[in-house]
Amino acid sequence: MQPPDITRVFKGPQNEFEVEIVFAREGNQSPKEGHTYDEIIVVTDGVIELERSDREEISTHSKYDTIFLPQATVHQITVKKAPVKLVIIHPERQEQQD
C-alpha cells in the first residue's frame, strides 16, 4: 500500500506542538507506528479504518469524527473511501524533528 501525502503546517518542537494535514487516496495506508506523545486525529472528509493496539476491534471513522490516541498506542490507518482529509494534532510533541 502507498502512504498518504502529509504536510506539516506547523512544525514546532520548540513549542511542543505540531499540526499535520493529510491528503489520502484509495489504496493509501499509514505505517504501523506509535509515538512518544499523544495524537488527536480529526477526519474532515472520507472514511478510514483504524487499527490500534489498545483495542481489539478495528474501528471505522468518517467526516467530523475525532480520535484520541494516547502516547505509545501503535496504530495504522487504512483509507476505505477516498478522498480522505485528516487534521492530525500533536499537542505535546517534544522530540526533535527534521
Per-region residue spans from a language model:
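Ligand-binding loop in jelly-roll beta-barrel domains
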Residues: 71-96
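A generic structural motif
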Residues: 51-53, 78
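Structural signal for conserved beta-strand scaffold positions within catalytic alpha/beta enzyme cores
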Residues: 8, 21-23, 88
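N-terminal non-globular leader segments, chiefly Sec-dependent signal peptides
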Residues: 1-14
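Short acidic-glycine-tyrosine-enriched beta hairpin
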Residues: 55-71
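Conserved short histidine dyad/triad with adjacent acidic residue
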Residues: 18-35
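Short, conserved beta-strand element in jelly-roll/cupin
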Residues: 35-50
